[in-house]
Amino acid sequence: MLSIPIHAGKLQLANRLVMPPLATENCTDGMVTENLITHYEKRAGKIGLIICEHAYIEAKGQASKGQLRLDHKADMDGLKELVKRVHVKGQTKIVQQISHCGDLSRVVKDRTPVNDLTLDDMKRIKQAFVEAALRVKEAGFDGVEVHAAHGYLLSQFYSPLTNQREGSYGSSPENRLRFILEVIADVRKAVGADYPLLVRFGGCDYKEGGSDKKDVPHSSKLIQETGCDLLDISGGLNGFLVKGAESDTFVELSQLAKQTVDIPVLVAGGIRGKEHMNELLAQGACDLIGYGRPLMKDVSEIDLLL
């Protein structure tokens, strides 16, 4: 099953193994470096898809010092070189993830109390997502992924632990999802109907009082209906970790999403072993499998799976 091709909208993949976005901190002032390019170049060739690590869409949304940038100062020549060096290795496609960290920045020195975003702030951020997505397309990436998971800004809207708003952007799951859907809709309109659009969605906080997995089917359906070609399901409010889950961390979420969507669903997190991966695919628990941390340590892991 891993070796069977699959498509997500216009994104044609040679197999179902994906390198998910994992930050390398290899950038200098947000610029593409040779170390960054080499990191992805070494992992390209056999794997179906690489999702390049999150890039910030505006300076206020920068998560860490070594993060890639896709704001107005983006290194377009470097990004184009990255895409070219991945593509020349063979069948691997590469998608770029775009993100806003919200209040999780490790570079902002002024830790003043966090205030609710105004409607004007939200409008500015949506436009920043749009402009970043257009830069991704211009650079030649095979698609763009909107990051709405792991405690960053968009998932802060979805989580009742971080979203204390009332009105149209708070309280109910539908309202808390609204800003995410608006970003997806605006990006879809900007990049066009045929350009592959992925969404990494944090479907459950796994914390008391947080977002609940029971809402995953409905939320996933709304994300698809808004223009998503591939749902990259995940969870956990602050980073990727879920206490007590050492394997198949988010498979239960992919299974819930599969109840209502007919676009491909990608899941990562503690999924190990070729036989087990094929079992999950055959069972319909997911359509693609992310395999990240082992590939960070040892590129040859790909040869054991494909």
Predicted feature descriptions by range:
Residues M1-L306:
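Flavin-dependent oxidoreductase catalytic cores
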